[in-house]
Amino acid sequence: LYSGMALGIIQLILMLFLSSLILFNQNYDQSFLINKSSITRFPKNNLISVLFYLVVFYFFIPFLILIKGLSNFNAQLILSTGFLNSISNSMLISILSVLLAVFTSLSALFVYRSFLEKNSKLHKSIFISITILLFIPSLTLSSIIFYLNFNLNFIFSNFLIVSVINSFFITPIVFVFLSNKFIQNYLYESKQCLLLNISPFIRMVKIDMPKIKNELILIISAVFVLSLGDLTSVTIFNDSSFRTIPLFVSQLYNNYKYDDAFFILSIFIIFLFFIMYFPSRFLNRNA
């Protein structure tokens, strides 16, 4: 726990430091262009440039996993039952989690906009109730839902519980990302729908969905990747028969099979890259 907190703090500090360096370089370039007519020109600070590239290299380290993993290619591991079950579990969980998150987010956005159109202050409660999930630790939320299922004598399967937990994590991300575009011109649209007698369902299908189509494709691909990489909700079950890709890699590490773990990670990274690449490619083609 302390190691994880320390690593998170270090990464946060490095990200803030990197951002400050970028802003410093931009401001320096702008000031240099403004004062380029002056006779004396001061060179850039070499130390800042070195620190900048060191921080960039730090965040580039995960990509070295690709080189390490692909150099330990193992065809038998890819065709093994454990890996195939893990990838199928991960895909099914992510698909169901994304569907639940998108449905919940669109429903919440619909209610949120309805309160805005009625000039009701209840829209704030909708926004807070969704976004507060961002501030609840993943382990806490997973434990609460697991405990509820325990009191119900485990009537829900592990697959469904993990999917619901993941959907809680990604729902506020989808909600916040789509909210600005979804409520855009809501007063004008509301008046036109009243004049033309357009039902809320038709408005959602014919007006809202085309309006947020591009943003929806991007955020679905992003949260799908996030759901694939989640490990917290799976580990609380302590069930070796129910494995996802992150748990499969973790078990390889625990068994000191580091080469196999790096190889699976490299395959997983390439797979995630294509998941993010094809939606962006589709949007660029239709732009």
What spans do the regions from the language model cover?
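Hydrophobic alpha-helical segments embedded in the membrane of multi-pass proteins
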Residues: 36, 122-125, 245
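Short cytosolic juxtamembrane segments of multi-pass membrane proteins
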Residues: 30-39, 117, 189, 240, ...
